[in-house]
């Protein structure tokens, strides 16, 4: 066997492993939040970015083995941004045989008309886009709307709300739309962005750049994203542990008196969630909760951790 053949075999092996991990992550999220049910018609919002391409492929893959029957329809919103390559997505979707609809709405023109030059257009653009997608879901008879946000997006939103909004609020894997008519799901909620990046690169999706509108980037979100990536590099497992924390909320040990009845605590009350451990030196596990090393990752050094040592 030639060296090139060996390299190709290894690349295919790694790609298969990566696809299985993404399938497992998506399958677990679907099961945990009951995202997809028998007979669902899922409207997959396809932006042309790595996340939505990956979401569509994994959902199509799961469709073959899922215990329930569901259908998919891909939807792209052509907002008439200058330079938008409108032929790319139809060609790709035709090539893989997926039902799709391209919705053409000149939201770009509306935003440019309403927002002064130099101001961020994202808020108005998002509202317009959301309304069009909700209307399209109704027209297509879709029972669920699938968005391509992943685990890193959810964590970034959590920190954005904590740092700038004063709220302990993230991005839910499943929710009712703000018009009260549609169920929105995020099947990639358990998927790591770096896995999606590697998968999209290997698949060579026809990625459409996301900066065609010329809008300024969300600098606050970019700061949070850079911070989390730095933590992930310096402290392997921290990202997984933080996401696990979002799934293990202890209201009695926070400070929201609307969420927990602190006023009702009196002599003789039951001990809730272990009582007060605040004066004890809290022992933390040597290996971060929820972290599992992949073949291409090294295990973190097993030094003892305590609250004071976490930076």
Curated annotation (Swiss-Prot):
Binds 1 [4Fe-4S] cluster per subunit. The cluster is chelated by three Cys residues, the fourth Fe has a free coordination site that may bind a sulfur atom transferred from the persulfide of IscS. It comes from the Bacteria. It catalyses: cytidine(32) in tRNA + S-sulfanyl-L-cysteinyl-[cysteine desulfurase] + AH2 + ATP = 2-thiocytidine(32) in tRNA + L-cysteinyl-[cysteine desulfurase] + A + AMP + diphosphate + H(+). GO terms for molecular function: 4 iron, 4 sulfur cluster binding; ATP binding; magnesium ion binding; sulfurtransferase activity; tRNA binding. Its EC number is 2.8.1.-. A motif (PP-loop motif) lies at residues 47-52. Its main location: cytoplasm. It is found in: Cytoplasm. Keywords: 4Fe-4S, ATP-binding, Cytoplasm, Iron, Iron-sulfur, Magnesium, Metal-binding, Nucleotide-binding, RNA-binding, Transferase, tRNA processing, tRNA-binding. Homodimer. Belongs to the TtcA family. HAMAP family: TtcA. This is tRNA-cytidine(32) 2-sulfurtransferase. It comes from Pectobacterium carotovorum subsp. carotovorum (strain PC1).
